[in-house]
Amino acid sequence: MNVEFTRSFDRQYAGLPRELQKQTKETIEFFLDYYASRQYPKGLRIHKVGRFLSLTVTMNHRIFVIPIHGGVKFVFVGNHRDAENYLKK
């Protein structure tokens, strides 16, 4: 499976505290383990938001993913307020 990360995602990830980076990495790995089967575990609280899939990292932090040909592209990681602003772009 093709997995891509935008430059903005990489910058956002780099700006997270270490513990949140660890949780984000674990969430991504967990999501990728289940993505092909589309049998998502409830703990990730995956849902559609516009053209994105939204994943829960913590109750206050989200990841946005876009399905692409042959895989997924991670485009955003951040808190709720930043996520709302990202969706307004």
Model-derived features: where do they sit?
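Enriched for short, Lys/Arg-rich terminal
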Residues: 2, 7, 11, 15, ...
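Hydrophobic/aromatic residues within well-ordered alpha-helical segments
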Residues: 5, 20-23
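Short linear functional motifs in flexible/disordered or boundary regions
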Residues: 21, 36, 40, 75-77, ...
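N-terminal G-site helix/loop of the GST-like fold
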Residues: 26-27, 69
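Generic helix-packing signal
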Residues: 28-31, 87
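A short, surface-exposed loop/turn module that caps and links secondary-structure elements
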Residues: 30-55
